[in-house]
Amino acid sequence: MLHKSRQEFLKHGEAVFGRATGFALLANLALFPDRFPPSARTITRAYAYRFWRPANAGEWIDIIVAALLWPLAVVASIVWLTCRHGGVVRDQFGRSRIQQCGDQFRLAFTSGLLPPWYYVFELYRPGELKKGRAFLTRGGTKHSTMKMLARARGSASPLDDKEAFARFCAKRQLRTLPVLFSVHCGELRGTVGADCGFEADLFLKPVCGRGGKGAERWDYRGNGFYRSVGGQMLSAPELIDRVRELSRFQPYLVQGRAKNHHGLRDLSNDALSTVRILTALNEEDRPEIIGAVLKMAVSNNVTTDNVHAGAIAAPIDIEHGRLGQATYSGFDPRKGWIDRHPQSGALITGRTLPLWDELRSLALKAHSAFGDWMIVGWDIAILEDGPTLVEGNCGADIDLVQRPLRTAFGSSRLGELMAFHLDRTEHIWRV
């Protein structure tokens, strides 16, 4: 009960945050539509339609809470973030703290971008502030227009359920990490004995989890024992019991721990580094690669490569598979951009990924199989024997890719395609 209450609280907190980006954005769209890039204008108009048509009382509450908190939250965020980061930006770019405050107020009241994104998208750089309206946010995509497109297209192939995803891929000969077994409310599903029987490193994660939350790594130490990243030792039956207990809150699945291709291991920090490759259906309903980044775990994280959990990401030249400078999430401008991995010292910038053509082909083939979705963010691992699907995300976090690529998607190819499909399906999602 406590777990479900916490999940519900976090869900509404994220929804309130998303709604808070909408007030000024929608007001400016109504007053000054020509100030928005054409694609961003179309996307924001669709967002406006969804914004003012809450599906239930909970969404009305989210709007009311966001409206009450938004002005105070904007002011408080500006003061706190400028105190925290203003000195670094002033020293590196010559933008005074007063100017930074003014920039953040302007962004919040003209584009809906809340103060943290001023630093995430580095809009303090000369000439960058004017691009604010072209950046797409979670509120305007993941929590609204992406869902509208999914409903309009009748999207139903399993991207949210990792267990069903693996089965779906296996039936279509798509390389993916196999599921050894799953546990639902304490019940084991799949072929597994009481002693577990897998003399290999294991990886546990929620069937419907996101962001790497709840994932656990257990390395096989021999004689039927497994060791966690934190040093806990469990026998095989004890590990089964642990998964049973975890599954009482949400279903879990167990996979063998995959390891990167030898040409990438010095960038992985002993976790599994994956390529987040964003694909979208074009005007002819054929998948097209929009952009890609390589995610890499750093510091003490040897379990997941999630950027929001502190990992770094490097942009990938989609034609040749060449890496650019890597970056953190951007919430701390002191960290900036780096050419080498912080722990291993291995070169990132200019490096070419192995098996890149095969990875691109797999992403396009996968989207063809999941063709009822307009946009998918694929996590693909480059293993010794080839690229392998880890998961697909129907609600891909746009900010995860916009920052490393230094691209505002509202004025890019993705924006064009989203606008095209929103226009084409308007007669459906307006019903």
Residue ranges and their predicted role:
Residues 1-65:
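Intrinsically disordered, low-structural-confidence terminal and linker regions
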Residues 3-8, 336-364, 368-375, 382-431:
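C-terminal active-site "lid" helix and adjoining low-complexity regulatory extension at the edge
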Residues 60-197, 209-210, 363:
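Conserved N-proximal alpha/beta basic substrate-recognition cap immediately N-terminal to
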Residues 183, 206-208, 222, 256-258, ...:
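Short, flexible loop/turn elements at secondary-structure junctions
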Residues 198-200, 230-329:
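Phosphate-binding site of ATP-dependent enzymes
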Residues 202-239:
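Glycine-rich phosphate-binding loop of ATP-grasp-fold ATP-dependent ligases
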Residues 212, 274, 295-301, 393-405:
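Glycine-rich phosphate/pyrophosphate-binding beta-alpha loops
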Residues 295-320, 324-369:
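Acidic/His-leaning functional-site neighborhoods
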